[in-house]
Amino acid sequence: MPEDLAKQLASYKAQLQQVEAALSGNGENEDLLKLKKDLQEVIELTKDLLSTQPSETLASSDNFASTQPTHSWKVGDKCMAIWSEDGQCYEAEIEEIDEENGTAAITFAGYGNAEVTPLLNLKPVEEGRKAKEDSGNKPMSKKEMIAQQREYKKKKALKKAQRIKELEQEREDQKVKWQQFNNRAYSKNKKGQVKRSIFASPESVTGKVGVGTCGIADKPMTQYQDTSKYNVRHLMPQ
């Protein structure tokens, strides 16, 4: 993942340089100005994502999570989960499970708040309630605080990734306009040169349509010597 982001970042920077070079000769072009702004934004978002990539597995809390999943979860299950905003445990429902990344999208019951949280941080309702009662209002441990901070950063990174996706779509929409701009610039540099079709009407009455595509369309057709005397019968053995 970090390697992919690094490649994308390099690509965005190269595109930004091209746009800035184009703006140096056409600083009032709205399409180019919009493209420059989008590229600058996506570059900053990608940098932020690179800086928030986790270097190790999310640490579990002392009283709430274990190092290995102890429950087989499925969509629709009720569970107890930690809310990243206050680090407290609340009842929630699993909306979606990402087995590859070991995460689940949950919605807190009675609140409607949605979050993406590691499966390791989920507990069955009864077990979670007991852990919450046992802990009471005890301050969060250092591991819990680290887990909360990382979860917050992860949630923020997901939003940034979504924004990058939106900007990518906008850039795709701008690609046609960008190509049109390049075509117009090329046409201006070639001003005075007329590109003729091979099917264009010749200027002289002796010219032939579609003949002489190398700049000789107005010249008469090449005359060939009559070779009818070389009949096949002359080639047959006597």
From Swiss-Prot:
Bilayer-spanning residue ranges: none
Entry keywords, A to Z: Acetylation, Apoptosis, mRNA processing, mRNA splicing, Nucleus, Phosphoprotein, Spliceosome
GO biological process: apoptotic process; mRNA processing; RNA splicing
Listed GO CC annotations: Cajal body; cytoplasm; nuclear speck; nucleus; spliceosomal complex
Modified residues (N6-acetyllysine): K219
Localization terms from the record: Nucleus speckle; Nucleus, Cajal body
Family matches, as InterPro entries: SMN_Tudor, Tudor
An example molecular function term from Gene Ontology annotations: RNA binding
Phosphoserine sites (modified residues): S201
Xref: SUPFAM superfamilies: Tudor/PWWP/MBT (SSF63748)
Record Gene3D superfamilies: 2.30.30.140
Signal peptide: none
Location of the motif Nuclear localization signal: 142-160
Residue span, Tudor domain: 72-132
Main location group: nucleus
PANTHER family: SURVIVAL OF MOTOR NEURON-RELATED-SPLICING FACTOR 30, SURVIVAL OF MOTOR NEURON-RELATED-SPLICING FACTOR 30-RELATED
Family designation: Belongs to the SMN family.
Subunit structure: Associates with spliceosomes. Associates with U4/U5/U6 tri-snRNP and with U2 snRNP.
Function of the molecule: Involved in spliceosome assembly.
Domain remarks in the Swiss-Prot or TrEMBL record: The Tudor domain mediates association with dimethylarginines, which are common in snRNP proteins.
Protein name in UniProt: Survival of motor neuron-related-splicing factor 30
